[in-house]
Amino acid sequence: LDLGCGEGRHTLSAALTAPIHAVGLDMSRRDLTTARNRCGDFESLTKTENAPSLIEGDGARLPFADATFDRIICSEVLEHIHDYETFLREIRRVIKPGGLFAASVPSFFPEWVCWKLSDAYHEVEGGHVRIFNARALERSISNFGFERFESHRAHTLHSPYWWLRCLFWRGEQAQHPIVNLYHRLLVWDLMKKPWLTRWIDRLLNPILGKSVVFYFSTDP
């Protein structure tokens, strides 16, 4: 289950990578339509047995039976939710005994800088409602019967991009030329994966990584 799947990046990636049944759930009908259209870009995902299920729904009331999923991810979602512990309770309910859960949220320092640079960044509809403290979030998740076995920071190069977005805030309108230029760098890095940016990412992730990622297990 990819909870809060948006336009399906992780859902489709999982379906393409392994022989699994991937399920993406999101509240945005528009994002789910985009995700379905993206499935058409991959021949293997047009086959019924490989196609992911993309469902419109609320993470606070998941439309699944108890102990349904072997793996659950919730990537960059919890920071948007006022009552995020309700999401965690539902995740615990629908994950199987022995299942694995991965969650990511914005890291404290890069997110704090974004909030300082632009009020609009977090005041937009559907925007971020809190800045998580990583240890506090880990405790919250652990309180629902999960045990963390790994965590790391990621996406150092994304932090300056969002700082520039906030500094030259234009919402969803055409971005400042500097922001567009940096975005081109990110796309190039994603496609080419040069050793230099990989090295910079590994070096600076502990300090500037835009996201913190947790991996949890449950008792068998």
Regions found by a protein language model. Give the residues of each.
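Conserved SAM-binding loop
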Residues: 1-114, 136, 214-217
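Short, hinge-like loop/turn segments at secondary-structure boundaries
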Residues: 40-42, 119-122, 166-170
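Short glycine- and hydrophobic/aromatic-rich loop-to-beta-strand nucleating segment
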Residues: 130-131, 214
